[in-house]
Amino acid sequence: ICALQLAGGLDYLVRIAENILRKNPKHINYLAPTVTYFLTILAGTGHTAFSMIPVIVEVAKSENIKPSVPLSIAVVASQIGITASPVSAAVVAMSGFLEPFGVSYPTLLGICISTTFIAVMITAFIMSTFSNNDLSSDPVYQERLAAGHVAPPREKNVDFHLKPGAKKSVLIFLIGI
């Protein structure tokens, strides 16, 4: 993961995720956890979610959705993604425990990826359906907005420059997985 970061591959993946969220802002409650989940699966660490937090907040605000809703699901999704990542220590350890019982590594991955992703989507549905998503009806936000403590959402960073080997580093990393 360090080599991927140094080559700019992680920045490239985050940029792709940002584009997905910004192109589909109305579905932020489902896409934010999906993006952080798959970033975690690819990277093997939940730290990739940190780079998505500002984007999730901005996109949610632009759609009048409380940022706490997609953020809470996204953070949980990134941590659950660790238990489904083929490069995480958690999955490697679990495969060591289950191998004597006849559960192969690919079988374990199939079970973990499908069940954890379904759980994330069910949680996103529950949060989207049963929580108050309307940012304009939040009195605390309205107070902070009136006091000038809340910054307006910023647009996509157009100054982003991709490092020369970023795309290749992602390809090499994916082949290595």
Located regions from the model:
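Membrane-embedded alpha-helical segments and adjacent helix-loop junctions characteristic
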Residues: 1-62
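Juxtamembrane helix-boundary/capping and inter-helix hinge elements in multi-pass membrane proteins
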Residues: 6-9, 22-23, 59-69, 95-106, ...
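Membrane-helix interfacial "entry" motifs
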Residues: 21, 25, 100-104, 108, ...
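Primarily residues marking transmembrane-helix entry/exit sites
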Residues: 26, 68, 166-170
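Small-residue-rich segments of transmembrane alpha-helices in multi-pass membrane proteins
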Residues: 26-30, 84, 145-149
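Hydrophobic alpha-helical transmembrane segments of polytopic
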Residues: 28-32, 71, 172, 176
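Alpha-helical transmembrane segments and, especially, the helix-loop junctions at the ends
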Residues: 36-53, 66-111, 116-128
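Long, contiguous bundles of hydrophobic transmembrane helices that form the permeation core
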Residues: 110-177
